[in-house]
């Protein structure tokens, strides 16, 4: 394992075809220490460990590691700015000079340490004292075997590493505010802290966070949001179900009350129907015959009224008995009848006809009183009488006498007497 690690380091430090040239800027080691350039392929391998002679091992280790540069001071480090050995270029003023090779002591057992790298002072501040030193401890059995480590590299004690004292830093309130603004504090809830502790993640108190920490924090917060949304949905569902249950209870109670009212109304309706049927039976038993007789009587009276009413008129005036018995002659004999020839003619032929018919009726029925028809136009008598007076006839006197006799026989009322008297006076 030791040879493998050493050969790997040689492959990294040296080019496969040798060094680029004898330029000291490219390879600062002196030619006195390296008399000739040797390739890795030309190295002789003898024995089981690869090298049998002590001188060859010294040359090999001197080619790999320069002990003078390991513990060199400032000028030695400044001469090799482009060194490929991997050592730090920073000066180390506190490093003690290189210790010479010490022979191995029989007691105590010597410890061989190979110093591979020493970090810079900045790395030493942040890390422990021994973190930048890699040592290989060899047991005492290696004394008998040929060693690859030169005696110049064997030291009994590790070189002391200086510790830098921290400088006091004074911050003003403005600087503190600026720092707080630049790196705000990370506020976490109790639920987030609990979930982070379950995840086994410890987040810093200040921002910013790394991508992995931000991813974990987002995951935790998403879990919390999902949990809260699930709780809200369950709460709303429970409230909705409680509201439905309350409504169902109210509707069921109202339904029971309405059912009771319906039953009561049905009972009342049945009682009313029974009462109505009883009343109908009573009316049929008592009023069937009476209703039939009354309707018949009403129909009979109405028919009689229709028959009697047209012939009976109480508002029509009846002629009086005096008007029925009175008789007014249509013609009057003038006093001038005898003055002209002794002949008289009837003034009106219609009047003579009526008188003749009246006489015939009296002869046929002496007990009946004949009423002469009334003259519809009484004004016609007046010019006839005037004509009779102007043209008297000799026969008027002869006709007037039997007419007066006829009227006297009938027993006319006193008005008729006056008329006859006036007629006689006119004749005189």
UniProtKB/Swiss-Prot annotation:
Which Pfam family, giving just one, matches this sequence? Answer: bZIP_1
Residues of this chain annotated as glycosylated in UniProt: 418
The record's listing under InterPro entries reads: bZIP, bZIP_sf, CREB_ATF_subfamily
- UniProt site positions, description: Cleavage: 338-339
The portions of this protein that span the membrane are 295-315
Q: Which GO terms describe its cellular component?
A: endoplasmic reticulum membrane; nucleus
Localization per record = Endoplasmic reticulum membrane
Q: Where is this region: Basic motif?
A: 218-247
Which GO MF terms are attached to this record? DNA binding; DNA-binding transcription factor activity
Q: How does it sit in the membrane?
A: Single-pass type II membrane protein
Primary subcellular site in the record, as a coarse category:
endoplasmic reticulum
Q: Which SMART domains match?
A: BRLZ (SM00338)
Q: Where is this region: Leucine-zipper?
A: 258-279
Q: Which UniProt keywords apply?
A: Activator, DNA-binding, Endoplasmic reticulum, Glycoprotein, Membrane, Nucleus, Signal-anchor, Transcription, Transcription regulation, Transmembrane, Transmembrane helix
Biased composition (Basic and acidic residues) is annotated at: 354-368
Describe the processing and modification events after translation.
Answer: Controlled by regulated intramembrane proteolysis (RIP). A fragment containing the cytoplasmic transcription factor domain is released by proteolysis. The cleavage seems to be performed sequentially by site-1 and site-2 proteases (PS1 and PS2).
Where does the record place the region Required for transcriptional activation? 1-68
Q: Write out the ranges of the annotated region (Disordered).
A: 71-111, 339-428
What family is this protein classified in? Belongs to the bZIP family. ATF subfamily.
Function, as annotated, reads: Transcriptional activator.
Q: Can you state the subunit structure given in the record?
A: Binds DNA as a dimer.
Q: What is the name attached to this protein's record?
A: Cyclic AMP-responsive element-binding protein 3-like protein 4
What organism is the protein native to?
A: Xenopus tropicalis
